[in-house]
């Protein structure tokens, strides 16, 4: 069996199936277990805690890496890059911010994989600026739906992605270009297991990692909002609740003004100030 140190570093060459099985054997952490481990790492520099955190999240890296299989790169390499992002996330994670590690780590995992794809998908880089990178990853999804673009479709894509039609044409041209020696020769991968079909299949049956990320982010946002509301005075808190959080009815400024014996304009001012305070508290 692959030991902990091996599974942390790189995907075992030619044995990706075994790696995935082992990664999935590691139990997922409860909230309390995760908090204890992240605090041990952050405040005591406990490397054993870091190792456990990384091992218990490898399954998420595997899942995320499958979403990038369409670029013709080995899944083992994508996983390796994702693992680097996971390690960076574990090192930077603050257990006091109130979100689960997986929510924080998704950004770092995707960021490392993005960089790897951009470095290796073409010998000549196709995306060097921030806007080009956004277009690169989104254009592949759009092209699966539309195929080759005509002028009208270029305009549609440009509007959808918030870029110019010129950028769309240029990126489509770059992505359609052929590179010399893009695919490695068979001699470079003598072991047939290295090119097993699992490395090129995208898992479309679930969206587990994104689902966990979304659920935890929504929980984090709700907790931040509740905490921010408690910082408001009682009247401001009631105004915000009545205007924005009451699902049963929409309270008008005048209705609230009548309850407090003030003008509707004064309620509007209080609401505006309260919203500013909430925004600052939530973004803090």
From Swiss-Prot:
Region (Sigma-70 factor domain-2) residue ranges read 53-122
**Sigma-70 factor domain-4: where is this region?**
228-280
Gene coding for it: rpoH
Against HAMAP family, the record matches this protein to: Sigma70_RpoH (MF_00961)
Q: What are the subcellular locations of this protein?
A: Cytoplasm
Highest rank taxon of the organism: Bacteria
Q: Return the protein name.
A: RNA polymerase sigma factor RpoH
Organism in which the protein naturally occurs: Buchnera aphidicola subsp. Acyrthosiphon pisum (strain APS) (Acyrthosiphon pisum symbiotic bacterium)
The answer on whether this UniProt entry bears the keyword Transcription regulation reads yes
């Amino acid at each position: 069996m692959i030991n902990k140190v091996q599974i942390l570093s790189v995907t075992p060459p030619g044995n990706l199936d075994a790696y995935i099985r082992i990664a999935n054997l590691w139990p997922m952490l409860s909230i309390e277990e995760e908090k204890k481990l992240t605090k041990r790492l952050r405040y005591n520099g406990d490397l054993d805690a870091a190792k456990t955190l990384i091992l218990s999240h490898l399954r998420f890296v595997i899942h995320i890496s499958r979403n990038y299989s369409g670029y013709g790169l080995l899944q083992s390499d994508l996983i390796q890059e994702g693992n680097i992002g996971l390690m960076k996330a574990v090192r930077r994670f603050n257990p006091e911010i109130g979100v689960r590690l997986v929510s924080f780590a998704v950004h770092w995992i995707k960021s490392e994989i993005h960089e790897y794809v951009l470095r290796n998908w073409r010998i000549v880089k196709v995306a060097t600026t921030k806007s080009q990178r956004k277009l690169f990853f989104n254009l592949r999804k759009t092209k699966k739906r539309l195929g080759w673009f005509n002028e009208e479709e270029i305009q549609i894509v440009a509007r959808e992605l918030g870029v110019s039609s010129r950028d769309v044409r240029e990126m489509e041209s770059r992505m359609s270009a052929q590179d010399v020696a893009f695919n490695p020769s068979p001699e470079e991968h003598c072991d047939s297991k290295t090119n097993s079909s699992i490395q090129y299949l995208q898992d479309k049956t679930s969206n587990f990692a994104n689902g966990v990320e979304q659920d935890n982010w929504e929980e984090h946002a709700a907790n931040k909002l509740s905490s921010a509301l408690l910082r408001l005075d009682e009247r401001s808190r009631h105004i915000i609740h009545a205007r924005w959080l009451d699902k049963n009815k929409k309270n008008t400024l005048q209705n609230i003004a009548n309850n407090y014996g003030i003008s509707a304009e004064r309620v509007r001012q209080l609401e505006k100030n309260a919203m500013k305070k909430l925004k600052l508290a939530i973004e803090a």
